[in-house]
């Protein structure tokens, strides 16, 4: 929203999803899993403070990216890959997890920033279960938890140290594994894939009595024991993907500042008692840039505008095609959406002001004014 511009980290989405599963949920759902673009012709449905049905928030006119795992133009954000681990897990083990009851050994009246104990939950049924650990809280640094003793289904795990920021799921009496300080990811063609949790030594105790300690990740080609494969976090989040690691072709894009901003936007407080977003008429006073589109293959290419400002709008032949509330991240646009004959775009940027009644994340440069840092095609 205009007045509140959070910067979503991969751990934010992942920890929330793990906590939901550990608390008894069986269906992972997302408001936006793939970001979108608002369609033409229904301006009366734009989300603003003047529309109570949309919770009194001023949203961009076109952009509906929502920092979703897959962005507005299909780009993969880091949390797309971290969440894949849960999606694979639920696909292969969801039927086992679904009837398991949730148990909460730690206190449930948790206050924000409470760092006095490790947050975890257990789900179990008929002697099998999972331990869900969350030692992460958004914008609240939690400490490393030492000498942690976990027990589920009557099985005691070895004492471990849980590093700050750790979010993971340990199996108990699942797939021939009595317990493991590693996370189950998937089972395919008789092979069981697990993730080594950074900072936690991997112990795998098998139901046949075999105990493997200090196990190192070996990837998808070499098992650590029989049909058990241990992967590092990157390999686990990219498991079964056939993405070819392409080297991006980056081209700098020429741009020209046509006009300085002629007046500051007079920020008003809307009916919901928060800052109200600029309307169409306010962009008449914005700084104006022209952007020359390079002669290149546009398919799958993104225009990336690194800028500093309050709000930016992008136009093609006088027609609004994209907008952005600045939060420290670049503004993006899919070049394949442009008409073939489009060779130049217009960018209008309303400057930042001192002491704006707007929440900006720490990644944002809130120095008053506006500037284009760099524009590229990638």
Where are these regions (language model features)?
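Extracellular Ig-like/FN3 beta-sandwich strand-entry sites
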Residues: 340-344
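Extracellular beta-rich ligand/substrate-recognition surface
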Residues: 277-288, 323-328
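Exposed aromatic-hydrophobic patches
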Residues: 170, 291, 330-338
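Carbohydrate-binding surfaces of carbohydrate-active enzymes
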Residues: 1-4, 12-248, 252-254, 258-263, ...
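Surface-exposed loop/edge segments in extracytoplasmic proteins
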Residues: 155-158, 319-324
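Exposed low-complexity, polar/acidic, P/S/T/G-rich flexible segments that act as propeptides
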Residues: 355-378
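Aromatic-lined ligand-binding clefts that engage carbohydrates, nucleic acids, or primary amines
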Residues: 295-316, 324-325, 347-348
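Short beta-strand-plus-loop segments that form exposed binding edges in beta-rich domains
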Residues: 347-355
